[in-house]
Amino acid sequence: MRRNLSHIIAAAFNEPLLLEPAYARVFFCALGREMGAASLSVPQQQVQFDAPGMLAETDEYMAGGKRPARVYRVVNGIAVLPVTGTLVHRLGGMRPFSGMTGYDGIVACLQQAMADSQVRGVLLDIDSPGGQAAGAFDCADMIYRLRQQKPVWALCNDTACSAAMLLASACSRRLVTQTSRIGSIGVMMSHVSYAGHLAQAGVDITLIYSGAHKVDGNQFEALPAEVRQDMQQRIDAARRMFAEKVAMYTGLSVDAVTGTEAAVFEGQSGIEAGLADELINASDAISVMATALNSNVRGGTMPQLTATEAAAQENQRVMGILTCQEAKGREQLATMLAGQQGMSVEQARAILAAAAPQQPVASTQSEADRIMVCEEANGREQLAATLAAMPEMTVEKARPILAASPQADAGPSLRDQIMALDEAKGAEAQAEQLAACPGMTVESARAVLAAGSGKAEPVSASTTAMFEHFMANHSPAAVQGGVAQTSADGDADVKMLMAMP
């Protein structure tokens, strides 16, 4: 149905207009099409447009670098996308309305911002208690995918719970305010029964159906135990998926996420739980993000993770793989997966679960450990670490090489240097374990101790041994250290190493 454009027609015809001629042609082509005009004549330019020509003229103008209207505001190169109210699937709008925000609208806005040359980053301004599970996981995956193109940050202002927490976790960085509420990583389902009310009213409803589960959960009868059990299994699976997504996006372990037991964290406690990165005033969010982006453009680094935080997350990832339930009986494969950069705990668990358990071995001590503790390694720890890291090296091959190498000058042992670190104070037990790790260096120990300061958790002897074995085989510092020590006296050792198969 043609729109009523009488007010525009009245202003456009028989009235003086201040229009540039080329744009005037486009304007009247567009208006003529809306009026149902079959043609447009411009005598001064000797141009005649028929109906298809009017459409082509309008389309050509719109395609000539004219971007579609934005559905977000841009401040300092930051596109601010509001995410408020209940989150729903297929709302059909790009802006929140009637207390709801659609997952489809969030994705559409993000895609538009990614294509907008004036947008350097996106800030999701979130104030939502959550919403539907339907569509939530796909939306979160899209946020995670699009953040590879431009930074996407989340501001919890002041609530980002449940489904909103899922979306926030998919962002590059999460900001919280002093009174923010974040978390609630869990799933719920409700059932209503009108059976008692109908009985009192004398109403009897008979459901006629085909298929044993066709009317499961209907509101006309009390919930049967077997149906309740099925529903419980469904929400347990959904919670597991929820936790795995948050863990993948944030770098936390699944156990750490599920360990929150759907608790809600306020302000600083959200950061301590690993669900947020920085506490700010909501009014400063845009300037904080813009400053970070400016720093990155100038060659600085995005203040997303300090070196200590990065080391802590990497250690958590490694230990999450080595100590997960699926790694039992598959320790060798778990160690290999832990050494793969970017391998998440969830991905490793899936691979381990599909793999057959490895055959048990007679000894739990690795060949690398045997090389490091042999008598000939005393005073030659760096060379021993180099040998221990070599494929197919055995203690029998290493001993004559170590014996032929001169011992290092007497000085503080690696253990003494590590134990003397400031970071070792209050963490002596962990420092002792690090000092015993094959291939460990003072700087590596310092970083690990700093990352674990005040947060170390007791681990079993088998877990410690497994972690030490991983460090022995995946520490580049050990190999570099061995090479760096080659001098005139060590040339023979290097030549002997190079000649080995």
Swiss-Prot record:
Keywords: Hydrolase, Protease, Repeat, Serine protease, Viral capsid assembly, Viral release from host cell. Residues 321-455 are annotated as: 3 X 38 AA repeats. The keyword Nucleotide-binding does not apply. One of its GO terms (molecular function) is serine-type peptidase activity. InterPro entries: ClpP/crotonase-like_dom_sf, Peptidase_S49, Protein_C. It is an enzyme of class 3 (hydrolase). The keyword Acyltransferase does not apply. It comes from the Viruses. One of its GO terms (biological process) is proteolysis. The active site is at 162 (nucleophile), 214 (proton donor/acceptor). CDD domains: S49_Sppa_36K_type (cd07022). PANTHER family: PEPTIDASE S49 DOMAIN-CONTAINING PROTEIN, PROTEASE 4. This is Head-tail preconnector protein GP5.
